């Protein structure tokens, strides 16, 4: 009963993905593209959605999955159970646990949910997975704010009504689909059981951005579309989306924001969401209380080139984020006890993460190393 569509993006030198055995299978539709023709994952997913042929359901997957026996029955039982609970259009989506490609065995088998991580400086909201608390006690899927593009199960009409924007590239795809699906009347859930595993590694396999030197151009266009669709950072909606890749009419963007505890215009997040409590978020008596419920966490990674750190006797790094006028918005230094772990690696870049609450977006950062012998060394700066 399965119809399978694969967007096969490959190179003549590839030896690990021969699909010849499936080309004559009437249930398998292979869209054959040279790797040089590919424009990324969202483009590929959009291509697949154009092949929808009236099937009752759609399950969107990445490559590299392993399934439990009876996964389809389990998934449909979850779907129908949610409908019996009053959710007309359930969308069951998840980051799923990993498996070891060499052994084929699961790395872990606990079901995951997604939580808010941070707003990127370019706009998109980022999420992270974690184990669903007390999942063994659950009898059904749990509500979600967010969407995973590598496992998404819904009615077949999802392929027509919530199509992937082929001009999206990578980051930003999932948050826009979460909002768009919600406005089309879909209710988002995470499965409370592990139905499959995904291979996340593949370090030796080239990605699209490894082969295509223009990927930064794709990224820039994608980020702009995310910001303008969701109004992130005060961007104004641009209806060149022609509504095909825009919102539905069953709910509004603001209704999603109230449901999820996210406000895109100023990158605001409610504490209820930061505490990883299930949606929907609490209602507020008036607009003032609603506005006061938002905090503005800023999370950022500064990459410092190791070659800039030539001394071997550092005692601290001053580490600050500044506004456009050069005033400190936040300062949290790297102290001496943190330095051994930070500097012991061999990577060319040293990653310094900071997270703090701010309404004003930082404009620049400063890392200023302090050496026992030389005192304050040359400062290292960057624009955000």
Report each predicted region and the residues it spans.
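Catalytic cores of eukaryotic secretory-pathway lumenal/extracellular enzymes that build
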Residues: 1-257
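Terminal low-complexity segments of carbohydrate-biosynthetic enzymes
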Residues: 104-105, 123, 127-139, 143-153, ...
């Amino acid at each position: 009963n399965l119809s399978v569509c694969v967007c096969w993006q490959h190179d003549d030198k590839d030896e690990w993905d021969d699909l010849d055995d499936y080309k004559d299978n009437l249930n398998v539709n292979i869209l054959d593209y040279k790797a040089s023709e590919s424009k990324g994952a969202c483009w590929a997913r959009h291509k697949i959605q154009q092949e929808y042929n009236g099937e009752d359901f759609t399950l969107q997957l990445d490559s590299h999955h392993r399934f439990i026996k009876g996964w389809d029955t389990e998934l449909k039982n979850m779907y129908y159970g949610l409908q019996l609970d009053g959710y007309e259009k359930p969308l069951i989506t998840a980051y799923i646990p990993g498996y070891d490609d060499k052994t084929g065995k699961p790395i872990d088998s606990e079901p995951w949910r997604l939580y808010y991580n941070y707003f990127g400086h370019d706009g998109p909201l980022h999420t992270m997975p974690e184990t669903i608390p007390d999942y063994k006690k659950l009898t059904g899927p749990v509500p979600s704010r967010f969407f995973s593009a590598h496992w998404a199960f819904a009615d077949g009409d999802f392929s027509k009504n919530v199509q992937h924007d082929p001009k999206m590239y990578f980051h930003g795809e999932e948050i826009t689909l979460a909002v768009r699906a919600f406005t089309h009347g879909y209710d988002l859930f995470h499965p409370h059981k592990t139905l499959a595993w995904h291979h996340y590694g593949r370090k030796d396999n080239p990605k699209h951005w490894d082969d295509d030197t223009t990927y930064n151009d794709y990224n820039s266009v994608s980020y702009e579309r995310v910001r303008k669709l969701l109004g992130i950072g005060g961007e104004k909606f641009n209806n060149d989306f022609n509504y095909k890749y825009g919102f539905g009419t069953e709910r509004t963007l603001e209704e999603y924001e109230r449901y999820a505890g996210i406000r895109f215009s100023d990158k605001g997040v409610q504490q209820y969401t930061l505490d990883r409590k299930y949606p929907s978020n609490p209602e507020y008596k008036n607009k003032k209380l609603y506005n006061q419920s938002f905090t503005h966490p800023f999370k950022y990674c500064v990459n410092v080139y190791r070659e800039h750190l030539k001394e071997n006797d550092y005692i601290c790094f001053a580490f600050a984020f500044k506004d456009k006028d050069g005033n400190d918005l936040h300062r949290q230094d790297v102290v001496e006890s943190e330095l051994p772990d930070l500097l012991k690696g061999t990577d060319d870049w040293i990653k310094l993460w900071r997270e703090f609450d701010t309404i004003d977006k930082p404009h620049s950062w400063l890392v200023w190393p302090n050496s026992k012998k030389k005192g304050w060394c040359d400062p290292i700066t960057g624009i955000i």
